[in-house]
Amino acid sequence: MVIIINKITIGRGQVVKGDVFIFPKGETLNVEDLYGFIQYQDELYRRKYEPNYDMYVSNHPILRAPLKAWSENNKLVVPMPRLLVDEYAGYFGGNAPTVQLEDETDNDSLQVWLNDSEFADEHSEIVKAVGIYGRSYLLAYQGEDSKPKIAHVEPDEGFMIYDDTIKSEPLAFVRYSRDYLNHVTGTIYYAGFSVDFKDDKLEEPVNYVWHEVPAVEFYSNEERQGIFDGVKTLIEALDKALSKKADQVDYFDNAYLLALGLNLEDENGRIHIDREQRFIYSPDADATHAKVEFIGKPDADGMQENLINRLIDLIYYTSMIPNLQDSAFSGNSSGVALQFKLLPMQNMAAFQERKFIKSLRRMFKVLFESADGGQIVRAINKDSWLDLRFTYTRNMPQNMADAVSTAVQASSILSQQTALAMIPGIDDPQAELERKEDEQSNSMKKAMNQALPDYLKAGVDNDEENSEE
């Protein structure tokens, strides 16, 4: 059941769980509908995307807190959001997924296109953006050479609109920007055509090669939450606790010296307080009880240390990212023991992998079935997106000997191509098999040539030269 969590105040659009936009199927957007979505998107930017980006680049809220008069004002930032996102993005997307087809000719063409379109880099940027914002997009377009290209679009630059059916199919993708005068320009991408717009004016539709909406949304969970969305308050509390800790250190460094019972009044009889030299004195009639000492307050160092350590542990625990600096990852722990420590992050990556494969398959469907899809695979095989195999390999330290041994054992019950895919560093198992076959063929020819009598070797060599010519 689709639950409407917000009705956009302008136009016919609605918002469901995860800040997902929906619109009546078969309809196109008018100006009112478009700006209803853009206004909600702007609010989403202010409420989520901008704060998340600020925290990722270490511009935390504590830096904007007002200064306190006559007090220490340390504002320390612990870059936990960047640490969590980069650690997980490297683990999940540090190794680009392999994309393969069974047909050798089409697979070779596909690998060339993947390299030419810099798919690995685009994929890594999507993984990072999903970690920060909770979602990201991949947009297909035609380059200047009329060849299909792809580019990632961050959620503060565009948004997807789905239809209101139970399957929630993509209905339109909007990419837009604002200039320094706050004028809005952009493009609405539909299936079969696009519409440019500027401010409150929609241009005439322009047909293009894409038979479906040429954009796909990537996300790791239906709620569209980023890696550190659930631990923001803990991170802010950590910044505050560490800053207070630094304030306390400064306090003891800058403690006031108190002098009692000494007649050090100025000529006007005023009690002198020197805030620059941090010195306070007060005369006392009984000079025999004069006292000079530093003013201090109770030391809460142990309590602060416990709070800081507890916050750090909670941030790692609730974000399901392991603390690689923890003592649990040192020593000679077995591979199985380390796998258990990584289990929460592995589970999260497994969920995200399924979501990403679903989105990637949809994108290749758009590419293969387009009017110029024959530039990637043969047009007759435009349905081959159904046969695509996506393989994700987690980026983590590997025991190559164990990996090779596992692949060898697996080859007895699996295909050689599947077994090779288990070995880290092999991005294209099919190409590796072809190279292996070529090596075996060349080795066999050399062995046969060496086994022949000398008077026959020359003839074989001549035959090989003639065949090459």
Where are these regions (language model features)?
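Extended, helix-rich architectural segments
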Residues: 1-149, 464-469
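Glycine- and charge-rich intrinsically disordered segments
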Residues: 1-15, 239-246, 250, 256-261, ...
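Extended, charged amphipathic alpha-helical segments
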Residues: 8-9, 204-337
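Extended hydrophobic-aromatic, low-complexity segments
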Residues: 30-34, 56, 63, 304-306, ...
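Short, charged/polar micro-motifs that form catalytic or ligand-binding hotspots
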Residues: 113, 128, 294-305, 346-353, ...
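Extended, regular secondary-structure scaffolds
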Residues: 127, 131-132, 137-224
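C-terminal helix-loop subdomains that flank or include functional centers
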Residues: 283-285, 310-324, 328-469
